[in-house]
Amino acid sequence: MAEHRSMDGRMEAATRGGSHLQAAAQTPPRPGPPSAPPPPPKEGHQEGLVELPASFRELLTFFCTNATIHGAIRLVCSRGNRLKTTSWGLLSLGALVALCWQLGLLFERHWHRPVLMAVSVHSERKLLPLVTLCDGNPRRPSPVLRHLELLDEFARENIDSLYNVNLSQGRAALSAPVPRHEPPFHLDREIRLQRLSHSGSRVRVGFRLCNSTGGDCFYRGYTSGVAAVQDWCHFHYVDILALLPAAWEDSHGSQDGHFVLSCSYDGLDCQARQFRTFHHPTYGSCYTVDGVWTAQRPGITHGVGLVLRVEQQPHLPLLSTLAGIRVMVHGRNHTPFLGHHSFSVRPGTEATISIREDEVHRLGSPYGHCTAGAEGVEVELLHNTSYTRQACLVSCFQQLMVETCSCGYYLHPLPAGAEYCSSARHPAWGHCFYRLYQDLETHRLPCTSRCPRPCRESAFKLSTGTSRWPSAKSAGWTLATLGEQGLPRQSHRQRSSLAKINIVYQELNYRSVEEAPVYSVPQLLSAMGSLCSLWFGASVLSLLELLELLLDASALTLVLGGRRLRRAWFSWPRASPASGASSIKPEASQMPTPAGGTSDDPEPSGPHLPRVMLPGVLAGVSAEESWAGPQPLETLDT
């Protein structure tokens, strides 16, 4: 019994000593019954604003267990079976690689900015487009008439020397009177037609152009002799026309009779104010039908009908070989470029031109290169009309011509302060012009990139049907009726001097062709969501879960890193060789120092634990890590 009581006394003393040590090392507990059971976790545990797991393993386990991404739970549910865990890990890794690969392909296509064409059909009343008609008879301007006759004689000499064709028979000598104010001109006879080389069985014919010093020569060759003669003659013809005064206008209405014999629209006669006239140096007298007519119904009876007079005047037989009418359909307020988009109608026929209109809507940057008007284009338009790409290309070429050759081409408008090219003022302009024109044909000039297509454009698709007109049975009275308006009386010439043209809408329906991006932002997000759902069954919320995992991992890395730094900092005095074994201090006011003093000493000496008060949570950590666990109890018992 005595031993039992002695043992009980020792245990009570040890208990009191342990309680005393705990009271010295920890904050005193809140007042309350010491024997009360701990409260339930839900009621007693107060959740913090942000809670982190204790390790990365716990973090990853929590994510795989609760994430909405398919396959993630398989990485932790079969932890006891390493084969399944490894297999599902490899499958998840392969799915991730496939997802990244397909997303890369998707983004690559998106950055190429592909577009698709959406075609829709609309039906509404449409204004008839403009129609330009030319008779194909270029005139000889009176101020340079004698120069043109010199050109005719020089052309006959060249053709005779090449093809042994005598064109001088039946022609009188120079008969044009010398005008009072004839501009000085010297025909350059060094630029003549010649055989350049033999290309197989074909003979190339052309002419040579040299620069002002004669050191650099350019050969303009053709496989067709007709094309060579026409281009050579056209070069000299434009060279002569450049001598005309800037204010000179050709009186192209001097022809006998009228070009337009009759005109009607929807059964009503046209008015004279509905025509605009001008003269083209190559295609002769031209008329533009400029009536504001709205097509009510399709068909010939509801379109424009024209009866035209066709004359074959021998003004420039080598320059113009056309026997008929030149026709071009173009948009309103657009310049007619007859050399690019026109076609011919032969005499003695009735041609029905059916128009079908398409509206094209193009996408601008970054999907394409188009412009809404002339404001955003680098090239200044020289034509006083709406923006078209052809007008921009012509203006760009003319400006480059002025910059490179110091003069402009006669068939195009001039920039401010420039003058037209002529051998009298610019002897080597032909060499410079054809060099530049060859670069334009081979797309080596910057005009193609400087002149984008319009973002909104109307394209006209034409279909033409022809028949003999007038017919054999109706020729008598038809020609007799029209003969009163200046046609020749000979019946064999009447048919070849007439042509009838009908301009109608094939249908009032028109197609609208609109460009749309293949991958707009909503479509790109939809494609990305489809791929994520295919490989992982993921959604936007699943991506937010991944983002949360990354944030938690970053925060846990910072916390664990800070804890390691604190441990290393507090363990540094223990690693000091002068510090002795750690002893337990029963009370904070009686803690001995290595020098034999107490904790009441103001400044303890020697390499021992410094007395540092840390704020916040770090103070508790430092106090907790400064004690040596259960070892003080054993020390007191001894």
From Swiss-Prot:
Alphabetized UniProt keyword annotations: Cell membrane, Glycoprotein, Ion channel, Ion transport, Membrane, Sodium, Sodium channel, Sodium transport, Transmembrane, Transmembrane helix, Transport
Miscellaneous remark of the record: The additional delta/SCNN1D subunit exists only in some organisms.
Extracellular side: 108-530
One annotated GO biological process: sodium ion transmembrane transport
Subcellular location: Apical cell membrane
GO CC annotations on file: apical plasma membrane; plasma membrane; sodium channel complex
Gene Ontology molecular-function annotations: ligand-gated sodium channel activity; sodium channel activity
Biased composition (Pro residues): 28-41
Origin species: Pan troglodytes
Glycosylation sites: 166, 384
Identification of the protein by name: Epithelial sodium channel subunit delta
Cytoplasmic side: 1-86, 552-638
Gene assigned in the entry: SCNN1D
Family per similarity comment: Belongs to the amiloride-sensitive sodium channel (TC 1.A.6) family. SCNN1D subfamily.
Main subcellular location: membrane
